[in-house]
Amino acid sequence: LQKNKDIRFKHPKDLTIVTCRNEGTLKDRIIPHLSGYEESSILEENMKYLGLDLVVLKDNRLPWRNTFKFEMLDKYLSSGKCKTKYFMCLDAIDVIWIDEPQRVIKIFNSYDCDALFMSTHSTDGYNCMPDVKRWVDSVNIKGRYLNSGVYIGRTHFVKKMIKEAMK
């Protein structure tokens, strides 16, 4: 894809957008509907197309495990490179932008929170945490579950959250 000259979103100056992925091909994780994005993820291409900045953190360990994200994000956030008020992390292989990033900041700020996560109906991963699943089901009346494929937060809080998750 080439940069889109007709549709370009404005990247907010106070937002860092990051994705984590493995070095090289993504073919072992691409669903058939997204074939063609094995070398450069659909998110990377989407961001280029819309003229948005994306920090791509890569790791050469295979097979890929999502737990690598914690280490990669911790290293990046501890490096001092991220100087923005807001920090957003997006999955590389199945997330695209369809609206202005400023809208996400507006939605985030409409809640009284330091981080806001996407939710899903999927219970993937909860089989490894039956106590957590029971607790979530006890407070969750809409059948929605936390999904870290898209989240935004105040950078200082996300930094602490990542460190806590690594314990």
Language-model features and meaning:
Residues A92:
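Short acidic donor-binding/metal-coordinating loop in glycosyltransferase active sites
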Residues V95-V139:
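Conserved donor-nucleotide/metal-binding helix-loop-beta segment in metal-dependent transferases, i.e.
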Residues G143-K167:
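Catalytic core and acceptor-binding pocket of nucleotide-sugar-dependent glycosyltransferases
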Residues L1-Y86, S110, H156:
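N-terminal anchoring/stem segment of glycosyltransferases
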